[in-house]
Regions:
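Small cysteine-rich, disulfide-bonded extracellular modules of the LU/uPAR three-finger superfamily
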Residues: 1-151, 159-200
Length: 200
């Protein structure tokens, strides 16, 4: 009789966006996983392909529409297709703390968290947009137009030496303006859980 393993993997993500100095929380929610891209990146990582790991956190301003009366409608996260991307990426920050291109690996980093005996492991990502970044941002968080740095979407991007990394996750949220008078920190958790279904 052929043995068939019924176990599998479940992946879920969660973001917390807040001011690291005042502790004001701007967003706290789950995100969509791009399972095709994630499966490819997992295989590339454990297969030592030299790419595939989490590398950047991308930010964009194309995730919502605001009508003339101020009502906000939210677009569907992009979680299918090999060419998936943010709707309109306007900024990205390297969060791979082993990369020589990471300008602040103490505050922009990736940690692996696991408790012995548990069937899940967390990838905990920290990304800080401090007061002076991005460059060319407005001085105050009172913009009335859709500037490049009024973020309403973000996603994790995998590493690829060609610079064309894959979108691994995508989350859309209420617009948050990044300006000189405001720092924004993102705590991003990806939980990878083994689903033990036994064998037949």
């Amino acid at each position: 009789m052929q043995v068939k393993d019924l176990s599998g993997l479940h992946i879920e993500g969660h973001i917390k966006v807040y001011d690291p100095y005042s502790s004001e929380i701007y967003e706290d929610k789950r995100n969509a996983i791009h399972y095709e891209s994630f499966s490819m990146s997992l295989a590339e990582s454990i297969g030592n392909a030299g790419h595939g790991w989490i590398y950047q956190l991308a930010f964009g301003n194309g995730g919502t529409n605001v009508d003339p009366t101020g009502i906000i409608s939210y677009l569907t996260p992009n979680s299918t297709g090999t060419n998936a991307s943010l709707y309109n990426q306007t900024y990205a920050k390297i969060i791979d703390d082993k990369s020589v291109l990471n300008t602040d690996p103490i505050r922009n980093k990736i940690e692996i968290r696991h408790l012995t005996g548990k069937n899940y492991t967390d990838v905990f990502i920290t990304c800080l947009l401090d007061f002076g970044e991005p460059s060319n941002q407005l001085a105050f968080d009172n913009a009335t137009n859709n500037s490049d740095f009024i973020f309403d979407e973000m996603g994790l991007i995998s590493y690829n030496p060609t610079g064309q990394g894959r979108l691994l996750t995508h989350v859309i949220f209420h617009p948050i303006q990044k300006s000189l008078n405001r720092a924004i920190q993102v705590d991003y958790t990806i939980r990878i859980q083994s689903l033990s279904g036994g064998i037949i």
